[in-house]
Amino acid sequence: MTGELTRREMLKAHAAGIAAATAGIALPAAAQPVPGGVEALQITWSKAPCRFCGTGCGVMVGVKEGQVVATHGDMQAEVNRGLNCIKGYFLSKIMYGTDRLKTPLLRKRNGAFAKDGEFEPVSWDEAFDVMAEQAKKVLKDKGPTAVGMFGSGQWTIFEGYAATKLMRAGFRSNNLDPNARHCMASAAYAFMRTFGMDEPMGCYDDFEHADAFVLWGSNMAEMHPILWTRLADRRLGHEHVKVAVLSTFTHRSMDLADIPIVFKPGTDLAILNYIANHIIQTGRVNEDFVRKHTTFMVGATDIGYGLRPDNPLEVKAVNAKDAAKMTPSDFESFKSFVSEYTLDKVVELTGVEAGFLEQLADLYADPKRKVMSLWTMGFNQHVRGVWVNQMVYNLHLLTGKISEPGNSPFSLTGQPSACGTAREVGTFAHRLPADMTVTNPEHRKHAEEIWRIPHGIIPEKPGYHAVEQDRMLKDGKLNFYWVQVNNNVQAAPNTQNETYQGYRNPDNFIVVSDVYPTITAMSADLILPAAMWVEKEGAYGNAERRTHVWHQLVDAPGEARSDLWQMVEFSKRFTTDEVWSTDILDANPGYRGKTLYDVLFKNGNVDSFPASEINKEYANREAEAFGFYIQKGLFEEYASFGRGHGHDLAPYDRYHDERGLRWPVVDGKETLWRYREGYDPYVKPGEGVKFYGRPDGKAVILAVPYEPPAESPDDEYNVWLVTGRVLEHWHSGSMTMRVPELYKAFPGAVCFMNAGDARDRGINQGAEVRIVSRRGEIRARVETRGRNRMPPGVIFVPWFDASRLINKVTLDATDPISKQTDFKKCAVKIVSVA
């Protein structure tokens, strides 16, 4: 590398400056896209995926003297083509906060563990001794259902896979769930219910082929800015291309919208049915496609809101226990069902102008226009999140606009490996790898065979999901709990009443593995210091099915260790006699006396690759600790679940040479579009389109109605609260709030409010207010200007700020099918602080 910049590099640097200026940030030298001069010659560069969202941007990571000193967009990465968003340009700083955790911390009093004690540094041996003692006591007294783990869409693939083995096969508990339950569960359930397989059929290449983009509950300009640049490039470079943006308030993505639609919260259900009706009434159903490739069903209605069973809304719900039921139907019945959603009715219900609704419907109905639908939390964090996901598939299936370049219903992802780890590995309470489930006896048997464990080890009943875990902790039914790579006391709904109380329940022992002292960590009994990002070898899977692997580039500080090391090392403290039932051991005496480490991780699969296979230019502390290439062993064992079943992954070593590959990877080739002949190797010549995840090869078109949210404004609590993110921060802010430039750009959460609403209440711009719900309250300053422009009766508060815990206010209602929380709709009142 020389000290000179090429014209291309200058353009990339200029783009970075524009992105930074948008956020009001000056790029320091450490964040420059391409450092130059003599200093650059002393930096070693290696590839890795970005640590933040699910876009999966490639970055080049610069290391000098054992520390990450710079990052820039990877110009060889197809996803981002050298660009990064403003968070990505500050990746070099996320690991170096001054309060980085470097040693285990245990609550102690008088030299021994005490629930009400103060945190004191301890050795790893003491930490694991106390941890194992607590786990064994709970297992002996209450059994496997009292042991649980809460993981993350930020786990590497190896970490998630190790967790699912440790919990399901080791402790025989399905009480494993990821924080992706809060963000992607509705999308995953809808994929499975519609296509029989999870994850998008398209890819990011669709951005260069679509003639229309429809954003449903997605502020891509701030939350997926790199993909937004690809969308904007297509829109601004081609006059015929249109953009529609639907939201409950006006945000930055609407600056590019040809069809800006602000609707009343929850009424997107009605809009989707109106569009389906419009397609049918105007005679633009692709009848040949529908006849050959779809089947019709009717969903159960009045399904409740996923609240506690004794909540009045659950008691009166007719089908709360059968929420997922779908009954066979036909096209004529579907036509009759959606015919009730007339333009006039939907205008009245949603508050949207008729002209905008008609223009939107015509985008989907026009047979000559390729449409890409995009959505994130506005759809998924919804008490009818599975429904709205399936309803957008209805539109693409009715018109045949699916599984080909530019015609793509595309669920965007919020975490770097919510797809690759939470969904593909199967760290949800009901799942196994490669779309298999614990409720299916053949799937359990298959997993037990791959894992080389006795039949009958994996329990058949799904475990507690994320919100239910909090409730069970509070109720004293879940007593040993290990949290990794998430900040759930800040992130969970109704956290003051349902989450924090469970963490501090004296009957429970809570372990949190993290890199910083988050609210969740400080609520625990034992804190384990974790390695992060390039301090370990890792693999992520992004939103377009792209698996990306990286080497360990630097060491973690102090005694911090990777989550993988922590789980595998902890498994050595248990023998099968302590965790498996007597009848299983009597039938399989060869397993007696073995440690879980021997059974799960030194099983002839995971330990089959010697450490000598690791690239000599890179460290691998886990391989040093265990004596074999554990990441490769875990990956190859995991990959055996999906090969030949439509989830094929390439050999592990190939990923080190690639900027990621999109599965299924068959005969060395990645798949860009699934389910269509000519693109997907699983679709045979002559089949055209085949949704092979379902036995009949047909996708489901589902009839479901508009139903109101769990809570709406009334005379006292007369404002809708919507929560979400901002450009500068990611999730709970535990990383980005420690980057000085990002903190200065947006130092604290504010209450975005309609100016007229503020005037009516005598509230000035910048004034402090109380945001009060039936569950709790916080204080924040009012913002009536700026990026988010609120309609009357709606406020928006981001949740990154630990000093303003907006989730003290939110409602713990969930989609009854997916169990995903609705963070977008609850009722509050705004009270001026005089």
Swiss-Prot record:
CDD domains: MopB_CT_Nitrate-R-NapA-like (cd02791), MopB_Nitrate-R-NapA-like (cd02754)
Keywords: 4Fe-4S, Electron transport, Iron, Iron-sulfur, Metal-binding, Molybdenum, Nitrate assimilation, Oxidoreductase, Periplasm, Plasmid, Signal, Transport
Main location as per UniProt: periplasm
Residues of the 4Fe-4S Mo/W bis-MGD-type domain: 43-99
Protein location: Periplasm
Note on cofactor: Binds 1 [4Fe-4S] cluster.
A single BP term in Gene Ontology: nitrate assimilation
Record's keyword annotation contains RNA-binding: no
Record flagged with keyword Ubl conjugation: no
Assembly notes: Component of the periplasmic nitrate reductase NapAB complex composed of NapA and NapB.
Database matches in PANTHER family: PERIPLASMIC NITRATE REDUCTASE, RESPIRATORY NITRATE REDUCTASE
NCBIfam families registered for this protein in UniProt: NAPA (TIGR01706), PRK13532.1 (NF010055)
The protein's name in its UniProt record: Periplasmic nitrate reductase
